[in-house]
């Protein structure tokens, strides 16, 4: 006997149980399964009122997952792509800006084991950080501080 189809509400809760989703992302995932008469907007409203769906939690989760590997520009662009805007972005932007140079230095040390020997290698390493979304200022600071700790035997 075939299984009965999963309701839209159950499917939404299943998605949210695995990880946080933005409102836009969840609506996109649920749209192909919506039957005639299903109201995705009402379901999303109910999920937000029940605190199953939260833009703040999603934003914090995405930043936490991406901050160790990517720069502010990349993270903020990804948040915009998920439909996060307004005050939530402004708060996260301020938090992210504080440690971007340090994060860039960590990414640089993780990828490249030694400081650049020549201009070509330095340009390659700078392009790598730019592709990861780090600002020019943060990249400059990262090159100044990335390998200072290695000289210290302590």
UniProtKB/Swiss-Prot annotation:
GO BP term, pick one: regulation of DNA repair
Membrane-spanning residues: none
UniProt entry tagged with the keyword Isomerase: no
Keyword hit for rRNA-binding: no
Localization of this protein: Cytoplasm
Gene Ontology cellular component terms for the protein in this record: cytoplasm
Main location: cytoplasm
Keyword tags: Cytoplasm
Function, in words: Modulates RecA activity.
Record PANTHER family: REGULATORY PROTEIN RECX FAMILY PROTEIN
Sequence similarity: Belongs to the RecX family.
Name of the featured protein: Regulatory protein RecX
Originating organism: Herbaspirillum seropedicae
